[in-house]
């Protein structure tokens, strides 16, 4: 579960390394899960890239440490909290996605991120 002030690693090559959640988008929502869109600020970035430190960005959560139950009865959790930076059209700003992503992204119409990911769990 991601809430305000949570730090996430960035799982793409947009230039940001770490972001901090400042708002979970949705009507009065407190927690974000896999597939939810958040507003975040860039805390650590690589120089000369598309995203700079202290930029305000939108991102979609692709991995969480919290256990996630699926309809089939399986449960899944990842080793880190990670997100992919997106633009207003829900397309990723980077051209590569690092690490596995959850299958729930396909159901939430983030098919571009799913196609760029090396592994879908």
Swiss-Prot record:
Cellular component GO terms held in the UniProt record: cytosolic large ribosomal subunit
Gene Ontology molecular function: any one: structural constituent of ribosome
Gene3D superfamilies assigned to the protein according to its UniProt record, in alphabetical order: Ribosomal protein L14 (2.40.150.20)
Lineage: superkingdom: Bacteria
Record SUPFAM superfamilies: Ribosomal protein L14 (SSF50193)
Classification via Pfam families: Ribosomal_L14
Coiled-coil regions listed: none
HAMAP family associated with the record: Ribosomal_uL14 (MF_01367)
Family: Belongs to the universal ribosomal protein uL14 family.
Subunit structure: Part of the 50S ribosomal subunit. Forms a cluster with proteins L3 and L19. In the 70S ribosome, L14 and L19 interact and together make contacts with the 16S rRNA in bridges B5 and B8.
Name of the protein described by the UniProt record: Large ribosomal subunit protein uL14
Species in which this protein is naturally found: Synechococcus sp. (strain CC9311)
């Amino acid at each position: 579960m991601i809430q305000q002030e949570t730090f996430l690693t960035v799982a793409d090559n947009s230039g940001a390394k770490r972001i901090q959640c400042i708002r979970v988008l949705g009507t009065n929502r407190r927690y974000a899960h896999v597939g939810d869109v958040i507003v975040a600020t860039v805390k650590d970035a690589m120089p000369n890239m598309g995203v700079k430190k202290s930029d305000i960005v939108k991102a979609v959560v692709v991995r969480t440490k919290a256990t996630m139950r699926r309809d089939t009865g399986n449960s899944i959790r990842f080793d880190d909290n990670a997100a992919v930076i997106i633009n207003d059209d829900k397309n990723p700003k980077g051209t590569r996605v690092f690490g596995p992503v959850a299958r729930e992204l396909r159901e939430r119409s983030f098919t571009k991120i799913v196609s760029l990911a090396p592994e879908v769990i």
